[in-house]
């Protein structure tokens, strides 16, 4: 049983992938909460409840924005590590999501300093549905990746 750089990459990826799974689950829960608050706060009769709901929506979007850069940077780190370890199959599996993250990062609104998840935009039914589907797809990808990294870590530790 030899400890190689590839085994280290898989171990670190396994731990960080657990964090990405947590991020994806948090996104799903947040979008589900936004879906329950889908009615426009202006439509409500009581202005106190409307302001309270609007603050809740802004708080959720603020927290979602805080998770975007760590998620993108962790996934970029995966790709750099697997490139350095010359794990081509694993790199090939991660590159499509990395390109999607780059596309998403560079196509955010130019006038906002935040990355995404602006409250009025997210509360659009189509955007909210898209974001929720994206979160479910990322959760599936990260779960499959987790078990793939676990298998590859064991394989590299045993085969070396």
From Swiss-Prot:
Keywords: Cell membrane, Membrane, Postsynaptic cell membrane, Synapse, Transmembrane, Transmembrane helix. Acts as an auxiliary subunit for AMPA-selective glutamate receptors (AMPARs). Found in a complex with GRIA1, GRIA2, GRIA3, GRIA4, CNIH2, CACNG2, CACNG3, CACNG4, CACNG5, CACNG7 and CACNG8. GO terms for cellular component: AMPA glutamate receptor complex; dendrite; dendritic shaft; glutamatergic synapse; postsynaptic membrane; synapse. GO terms for biological process: neurotransmitter receptor localization to postsynaptic specialization membrane; regulation of AMPA receptor activity; regulation of membrane potential; synaptic transmission, glutamatergic; vesicle-mediated transport. The chain crosses the membrane at residues 11-31, 73-93, 139-159. This is Protein cornichon homolog 3. Belongs to the cornichon family. Residues 32-72, 160 are lumenal. The lineage of its organism: Eukaryota, Metazoa, Chordata, Craniata, Vertebrata. It is a multi-pass membrane protein. It is found in: Postsynaptic cell membrane. Regulates the trafficking and gating properties of AMPA-selective glutamate receptors (AMPARs). Promotes their targeting to the cell membrane and synapses and modulates their gating properties by regulating their rates of activation, deactivation and desensitization.
């Amino acid at each position: 049983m030899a400890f190689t750089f590839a085994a280290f990459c898989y171990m670190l990826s396994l731990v960080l992938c657990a964090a990405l799974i947590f991020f994806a689950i948090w996104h799903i829960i947040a979008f589900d909460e936004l879906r329950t608050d889908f009615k426009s706060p202006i439509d409500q009769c009581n202005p106190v409840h409307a302001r309270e709901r609007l603050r809740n929506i802004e708080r959720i979007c603020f927290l979602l924005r805080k998770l975007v850069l760590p998620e993108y940077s962790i996934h970029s780190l995966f790709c750099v590590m697997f490139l350095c370890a010359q794990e081509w199959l694993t790199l090939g599996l991660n590159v499509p999501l990395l390109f999607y993250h780059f596309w998403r990062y560079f196509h955010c609104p130019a006038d906002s300093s935040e990355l995404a998840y602006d409250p009025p935009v997210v509360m659009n039914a189509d955007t909210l549905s898209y974001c929720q589907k994206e979160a479910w797809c990322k959760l599936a990808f990260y779960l499959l990746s987790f078990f793939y990294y676990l298998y590859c870590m064991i394989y590299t530790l045993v085969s070396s």
